[in-house]
């Protein structure tokens, strides 16, 4: 999911800022779910985020979202045969996240979930 957020940055400085903010939200979520904070620094944390952000389908979708397309329009026009894993995850976790977690603590996640669920521009 956060790779889409990072991909929406229209230049490297914006993407870098979004990467840092994404990591902060991930740290909050790990703490919220009582996970191991060291996870964030490993392959399952920033390692996976980096790989996804620089070359994955989620990042590519984020690029289209950052250019002003809705999720549905971008999927149909640019990625009709691609699986965007972040969409599937977003639809699975959104009911819980939107209902239970303080939206001010994870604004990037909340905005992206609403972008996907309600087909809004980012």
How does the language model describe each region?
Residues 2, 6, 10, 20-21, ...:
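NAD(P)-dependent Rossmann-like dehydrogenase/reductase catalytic/cofactor-binding core
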Residues 14-18:
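Short, contiguous, pocket-lining structural segments
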């Amino acid at each position: 999911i956060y790779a889409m957020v990072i991909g929406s940055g229209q230049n490297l400085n914006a993407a870098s800022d979004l990467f840092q903010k994404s990591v902060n939200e991930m740290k909050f979520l790990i703490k919220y779910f009582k996970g191991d904070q060291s996870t964030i620094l490993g392959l399952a944390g920033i390692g996976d985020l980096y790989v996804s952000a620089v070359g994955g389908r989620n990042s590519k979708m984020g690029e289209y979202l950052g250019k002003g397309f809705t999720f549905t329009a971008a999927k149909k026009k640019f990625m009709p045969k691609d699986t965007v894993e972040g969409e599937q995850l977003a639809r699975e976790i959104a009911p819980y996240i939107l209902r239970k977690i303080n939206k001010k603590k994870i604004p990037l996640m909340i905005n992206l979930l609403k972008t996907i669920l309600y087909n809004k521009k980012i």
